[in-house]
C-alpha cells in the first residue's frame, strides 16, 4: 500500500524484524516515513513481520525470502498455553478456544489514507475477526482496530477484546507513560521494561485521564531522549475504561496490547452482531520523544481534533473569579475587563441556573437547566446583549451527563441514573451528585436536548464548557437487562458518542471544551467532538509546567486550555509573580481564570501587552511543531521547550526556572527544529526587565542556536522591591 521509499535502515530492521515464510503474502502498510508489514497468507495464521522505518520494495522482497514465521499479528486465547492474548471468548457451546486463519484481505484507498482489512475465521466456528489498519498518506500514524463478528447459532461471550497488538524486540527498551490524580494530572513516569507485566489502566467509568493516560511511548535505544533515538508511541482513541499491557515473558519480544478494559465488562455478542473496538494509533520516529509527539500533534490537528485548523480565542472564565457568586452586574464587568485587555471571549461558569433548587453551591440543581432569574434578571439574552455591546463572544458552563438528588430532574426521573439494584446510592460531589445512564436512549435524548434547547434559544452562544465531575460508582443500569449489566461501561460511552454525534451534526461550528473535574477527558476518543480540554483544575503555574509537559507528549498546544490565575493560587496557595503565570499560560491556549478587578493598573497593562503579543505568536504555538528541550522532571532547575513554524521562519522559545538557590548553576539549553542556514532575530515577549536582554534584536544562525543556545539570565532585571525567586522568558525568533 503506497509507495516504497528507497532507503534501507538496518538498525530499524534489527529493531522489529521477524522473518516471514518463504511463500508468505506480505503486505506493507506505509506512511511517509514508516512501514508496518504483516503476513496475510490465505489459509494460514495471521503474522506480524515488521514495524519501523519505511522499507523499499527490495527490502520487502528480502523479508519474503526470510525463513521461519513471525509472531501472531493478533494473538487469540486457547491453544497457545500461557501466552497473553488479545482476544478470548466463550462460544455458544462453552468452548473457550479460538484458532483463527486468514480468510482474505482487502485494501481501500481513502481520501487521506490507505486501509487494510484482514479477515480471520475460526477453523470450526462461524466466528470472524477483521483486523484493520489505517495508514495516513501525509503523517506517520497507523491506526489499528478490530471488528468481531458472531455468525454462530447463539450469543458468544467476549471476555478479552483488545483493539491492537504490537510485538517489540527486546533490548534496552524504556516505557514513558502518564499518571496522576485530580489537580495533579499528566505526571511523567519512565521505566525500563523488565520481565513481568506492566499495566496502565483506567476504570473511572465516565472520565479516563486523571489517574493514568491511555497513551504510552517506547524508547528502543535506552532511556528516552527528546530529539534523538527510535521511539514508538501508542494512543487508544477511546473515552471510556481502557487497559494497556506491556508483557515481557521468556520470548524475544515485549508484547504490547491495547484495548477496552475487560474489568466487569464481559460482552455478550449476539448472533449476527459485530463489535467494533476503538482504534489505537501508533507512530514511529527516530527523532526521539518529541518526534513522535509532532506526529501525533499533526495527525490530531488534521484528522481528529474538532476545528483543528481554527485558531482558539483568548478567553476569561468566571470560575476562580467568582465561583458560584454569579450575578448580572458582575458578569458584565468581567466582560468589559477581558475586552479591555484584548480578550475575545467570556465564559460564565457554574452557578447560573436552578429554579426550585438554586445553584448556589455544588449540592443541587444539576439537570435543571433553567436560568436563576434572581441572579440574572434579564436571563441569557441579557448577557448576550452585554457581550455584543462589549465586543466579545459569550460562552457558558454545562454538566449535561450529571444530576443531583436535590433536583427537579431526579425527582421526576430517578430511573434515569446509574444505580445498582437493591443498593443505596453512593453520592458524589456535594454529597448529592449522580450520573445519568447514557445507555438509556431516553437519557441520550435528554442530554442532547440540553445543548439543543440552549443553542436553539440562544444561537449566539459561541462556546460551551462541558463538565463531568463524577465517576461511575453505582455499577448498575436501570435500563439494561439483568443479563447485560456488564455492558454498562461500554454502553455508557456508546451513548455518550451518539449524543456528541447528534450535537456536532446540528452545531458543527460550536466550540466545546471537555472539562471533566479538570483533565479527566484528555483523550483522542472525545477530541473528534471537542475543541480542547481543561488540563487540570490546578492552575498553579509551576505545577502546570509539569502537567502541560506530560500532556504535550500526545496532545498539541491548541488542545490545552492554559489560564492565568490568581496569586496566591487557589489550589496550592503558592504566590507566583504575574509574569511567570503569563509565560506558562502563553505556551498553551491562552486564557484567564481570575477576577480582573483585583488586578492593579500595572498588572492589567502587563496582561494587555501579553495578550497582544500572544496574538502575534498564536499561529506558531497552536499550529507549530513542538521541540521539548529540558524536562522539568530531570530536576535541573529549569524547563524549556519551543514551537517552530512549518516553514521554520518563526519560532517561540520558552524558559521557566523551576527552583531557586543561591549560586546555583543552570544548564544552557540548545534549541532545536530551526533551519541551520537561516539567521534568526531575537525578541523577548512579555518583558518586564528594566533593560533588554544582551541578545535582544540580534541575529544568530539556526546552526549556532541549535548547538549552543543562548545564555539566559537567572533572574529578572527589575527594581529591588520587585525582585523574587521566580524567572521566566519567552523569546520570539524570526528569520531574516
Show where each model-derived region lies:
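Polysaccharide-binding surfaces and accessory modules of carbohydrate-active proteins
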Residues: 25-38, 45-247, 263, 679-695
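Short Pro-Gly-centered flexible turn/kink motifs
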Residues: 33, 98-100, 267-286, 726-734
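Conserved, mostly hydrophobic/aromatic
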Residues: 33, 146, 272, 387, ...
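Carbohydrate-binding surface patches
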Residues: 33, 216-218, 226, 632-676
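Glycine-rich, aromatic-flanked loop segments that form ligand/cofactor-binding clefts
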Residues: 78-100, 226-240, 283-305, 343-350, ...
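Aromatic-lined carbohydrate-binding/catalytic grooves of carbohydrate-active enzymes
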Residues: 307-449, 458, 463
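Active-site neighborhood of glycoside hydrolase catalytic domains
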Residues: 377-379, 411-413, 417-579, 589, ...
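C-terminal beta-sandwich/jelly-roll accessory domains of carbohydrate-active enzymes
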Residues: 659-736
Amino acid at each position: 500500500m503506497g509507495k516504497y521509499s528507497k532507503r534501507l535502515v538496518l538498525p530499524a530492521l534489527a529493531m522489529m524484524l521477524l522473518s516471514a515464510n518463504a511463500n508468505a503474502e506480505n503486505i506493507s502498510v506505509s506512511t511517509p516515513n514508516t512501514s508496518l508489514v504483516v503476513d496475510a497468507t490465505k489459509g494460514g495464521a495471521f503474522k506480524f513481520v515488521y514495524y519501523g522505518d519505511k522499507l523499499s520494495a527490495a527490502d520487502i522482497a528480502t523479508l519474503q525470502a526470510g525463513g521461519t514465521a513471525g509472531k501472531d499479528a493478533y494473538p487469540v486465547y486457547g491453544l497457545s498455553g500461557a501466552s497473553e492474548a488479545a482476544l478470548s471468548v466463550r462460544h455458544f457451546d462453552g468452548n473457550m478456544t479460538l484458532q483463527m486463519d486468514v480468510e482474505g484481505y482487502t485494501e481501500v484507498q481513502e481520501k487521506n489514507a490507505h486501509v487494510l482489512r484482514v479477515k480471520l475465521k475460526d477453523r470450526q466456528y462461524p466466528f470472524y475477526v477483521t483486523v484493520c489498519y489505517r495508514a495516513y498518506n501525509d503523517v506517520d500514524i497507523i491506526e489499528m482496530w478490530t471488528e468481531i463478528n458472531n455468525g454462530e447459532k447463539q450469543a458468544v461471550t467476549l471476555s478479552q477484546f483488545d483493539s491492537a497488538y504490537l510485538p517489540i524486540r527486546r533490548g534496552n527498551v524504556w516505557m514513558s507513560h502518564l499518571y496522576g490524580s485530580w489537580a495533579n494530572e499528566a505526571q511523567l513516569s519512565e521505566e525500563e521494561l523488565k520481565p513481568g507485566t506492566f499495566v496502565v489502566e483506567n476504570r473511572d467509568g465516565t472520565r479516563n485521564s486523571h489517574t493514568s493516560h491511555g497513551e504510552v511511548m517506547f524508547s528502543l535505544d535506552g532511556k528516552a531522549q527528546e530529539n534523538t533515538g527510535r521511539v514508538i508511541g501508542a494512543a487508544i482513541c477511546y473515552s471510556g475504561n481502557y487497559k494497556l499491557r506491556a508483557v515481557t515473558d521468556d520470548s524475544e519480544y515485549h508484547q504490547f496490547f491495547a484495548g477496552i478494559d475487560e474489568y466487569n465488562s464481559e460482552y455478550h455478542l449476539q448472533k449476527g452482531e459485530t463489535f467494533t473496538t476503538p482504534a489505537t494509533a501508533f507512530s514511529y520516529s527516530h527523532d526521539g520523544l518529541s518526534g513522535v509527539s509532532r506526529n501525533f500533534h499533526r495527525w490530531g490537528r488534521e484528522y481528529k481534533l474538532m476545528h483543528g485548523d481554527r485558531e482558539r480565542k483568548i478567553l476569561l472564565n468566571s470560575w476562580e473569579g467568582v465561583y458560584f457568586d454569579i450575578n448580572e452586574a458582575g458578569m458584565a464587568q468581567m466582560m468589559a475587563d477581558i475586552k479591555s485587555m484584548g480578550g475575545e471571549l467570556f465564559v460564565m461558569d457554574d452557578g447560573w441556573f436552578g429554579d426550585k433548587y438554586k445553584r448556589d453551591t455544588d449540592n443541587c440543581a444539576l439537570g435543571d437547566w433553567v436560568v436563576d432569574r434572581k441572579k440574572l434578571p434579564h436571563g441569557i439574552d441579557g448577557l448576550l446583549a452585554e457581550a455584543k455591546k462589549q465586543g466579545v463572544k459569550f460562552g457558558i458552563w454545562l454538566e449535561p451527563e450529571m444530576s443531583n438528588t436535590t433536583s427537579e430532574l431526579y425527582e421526576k426521573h430517578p430511573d434515569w441514573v446509574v444505580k445498582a439494584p437493591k443498593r443505596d446510592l453512593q453520592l458524589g460531589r456535594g454529597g448529592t451528585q449522580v450520573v445519568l445512564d447514557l445507555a438509556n436512549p431516553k437519557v441520550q435524548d435528554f442530554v442532547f436536548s440540553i445543548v439543543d434547547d440552549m443553542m436553539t434559544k440562544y444561537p449566539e452562544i459561541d462556546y460551551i464548557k462541558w463538565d463531568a465531575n463524577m465517576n461511575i460508582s453505582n455499577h448498575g443500569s436501570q435500563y439494561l437487562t439483568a443479563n447485560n449489566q456488564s455492558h454498562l461501561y461500554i454502553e455508557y460511552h456508546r451513548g455518550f458518542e451518539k449524543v456528541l454525534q447528534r450535537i456536532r451534526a446540528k452545531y458543527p461550528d460550536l466550540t466545546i471544551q471537555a472539562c471533566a473535574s479538570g483533565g479527566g477527558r484528555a483523550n483522542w476518543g472525545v477530541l473528534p467532538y471537542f475543541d480542547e480540554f481543561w488540563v487540570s483544575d490546578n492552575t498553579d503555574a509551576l505545577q502546570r509546567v509539569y502537567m502541560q509537559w506530560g500532556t504535550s507528549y500526545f496532545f498539541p498546544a491548541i488542545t490545552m486550555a492554559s489560564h492565568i490565575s490568581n496569586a496566591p493560587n487557589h489550589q496550592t496557595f503558592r504566590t507566583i509573580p504575574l509574569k511567570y503565570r503569563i509565560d506558562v499560560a502563553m505556551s498553551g491556549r491562552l486564557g484567564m481564570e481570575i477576577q480582573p478587578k483585583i488586578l492593579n493598573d500595572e498588572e492589567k497593562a502587563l496582561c494587555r501587552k501579553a495578550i497582544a503579543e500572544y496574538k502575534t505568536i498564536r499561529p506558531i504555538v497552536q499550529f507549530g511543531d513542538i521541540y521539548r528541550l529540558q524536562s522539568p522532571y530531570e530536576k535541573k532547575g529549569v524547563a524549556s521547550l519551543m514551537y517552530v513554524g512549518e516553514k521554520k521562519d518563526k519560532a517561540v522559545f520558552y524558559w521557566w526556572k523551576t527552583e531557586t538557590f543561591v549560586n546555583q548553576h543552570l544548564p544552557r539549553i540548545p534549541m532545536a527544529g530551526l533551519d541551520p542556514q537561516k539567521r534568526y532575530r531575537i525578541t523577548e515577549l512579555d518583558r518586564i526587565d528594566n533593560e533588554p536582554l544582551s541578545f535582544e534584536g540580534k541575529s544568530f544562525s539556526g546552526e549556532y542556536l541549535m548547538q549552543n543556545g543562548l545564555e539566559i539570565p537567572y533572574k529578572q532585571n527589575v527594581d529591588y522591591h520587585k525582585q523574587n525567586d521566580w524567572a521566566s522568558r519567552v523569546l520570539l525568533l524570526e528569520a531574516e
